[in-house]
Curated annotation (Swiss-Prot):
GO molecular function, one term: oxidoreductase activity, acting on paired donors, with incorporation or reduction of molecular oxygen
Function of the molecule: Hydroxylase that can catalyze the in vitro conversion of the sesquiterpenoid nootkatone, a natural organic compound produced by some plants, to at least five hydrophilic products. The native ferredoxin reductase FdR_B and either Fdx2 or Fdx8 ferredoxins can act as the redox partners for the conversion of nootkatone. In addition, acts as a steroid 1alpha-hydroxylase, when associated in vitro with the surrogate redox partners bovine adrenodoxin (Adx) and adrenodoxin reductase (Adr). Can use their derivatives testosterone-acetate and 11-oxoandrostenedione, but not vitamin D3 and 25-hydroxyvitamin D3.
Family in the record: Belongs to the cytochrome P450 family.
Annotated source species: Sorangium cellulosum (strain So ce56) (Polyangium cellulosum (strain So ce56))
EC main group: oxidoreductase
Biotechnology annotation for this entry: The production of regio- and stereoselectively hydroxylated steroids is of high chemical/pharmaceutical interest. Mutagenesis can change the selectivity of cytochrome P450-mediated steroid hydroxylation, providing the basis for further experiments to engineer the biocatalyst toward novel steroid hydroxylation positions.
Protein name per UniProt: C-19 steroid 1alpha-hydroxylase
EC number of this enzyme: 1.14.15.19
Result when mutating S276I: Affects the regioselectivity of substrate hydroxylation. Produces mainly 17alpha-hydroxyprogesterone with progesterone as substrate
Pfam families: p450
Keywords, in A-Z order: Heme, Iron, Metal-binding, Monooxygenase, Oxidoreductase
Amino acid sequence: MDFPLANLFFVPSEDATAFGRRLRAAAQQAPIVFDTAFGMPILLRKSHITTAYRDTATFSTRMFQAGILNGGLAAMQGDEHARMRRVYNMFFLPRAVSQYEERFVRPISEQVVDRLAGKPRVDLLEDFAMELPRRVIGELFGFPAEKLHETDERVRAMLRGLVRMHDPAAVAESQRAYGETLGLITEVVERESRDTSDTLLGEILRTLKAEHMDTIEASRQIVLSLILGGYETTSWLVANTIHALLAHPDTLARVRQDPSLLPAAIEEGMRWCPSSFGVLRMVERDVRLDDQALSAGTVVCLAGIAGNYDETAYPSPEVYDIDRKPLPAANVFGGGAHFCVGAPLARMEARVGLQALLARFPGLRAVPEERPSFMYGAKDSVAHGPDKLPVLLH
């Protein structure tokens, strides 16, 4: 393999569109590049990525079997994955998501917004975009409130080890954080198994029992998988959508006046300023994609978000336009058999939280002299987003 070298990810910019435009520019030069900072080949061409999503025998997630996700949904293949995926899907059916909205997300959103009231100025990244998913995860799984912030840091450490698997220090830190988090997960699972509640964790235990899979290990793996996906995905989705709206006051005014536009604002936000870098796959056999050769055993990144700035799909892609028809494809959730199972919850959480925020603070606006900087790896995460979101509330 001899691909052009690139540095696509760890590049800060005050322009929220720089990441997407940089990936698109790279895709126009070569279908596959080797990112020197990321340490792996990056697939940029849509046809190659579609092939990789569909051909799970050639492009697998088997590399996760060697780490903290071993035994979890992300590491499973074939029939085993299909069976467990069916179990996971039960937790995110429309009826279930609607119940989470009314019982957890809506009241928590109001509580988080209440805590902002009376402050003339806040950082919506820390005080809202991070706080909302943190609180929701805590309630859904019954985590003690005093454990939420340290769990947040451990989740980031675990994710860094999963994504930067070529970095021994990141992997070691991930394993340490995993051991600490596993103790907390075991504690809440054992407590819930003695007295099953109406939380998501209670629903998980009841479902596993009905499927004759009710073991502590199965429960722990599901909780771990959902925590790893639930924190970062939603936090950065919310943060990037907030920035998109603040940067476009006319659109912000429209959405505030008509909250039914929020789903479009969120979907376009995921295109305009994507939080995800892509997804990882392991090449199981020597394969050629057109004239590009990939060797068995290579871990690659499928950067589907390179298509977010494809002018043929999205005219004037640098423009944040919530009236695009059809709505942009949400590449941040991956694709194929391993498409993010919690996407309905993340979308709902963003919609409900943003609606509460905009309704409470009609004077919400950015602090003009403090522009956030955007980068993949913001705040030591594995996401693309801002380092801050300073706003005036009134």
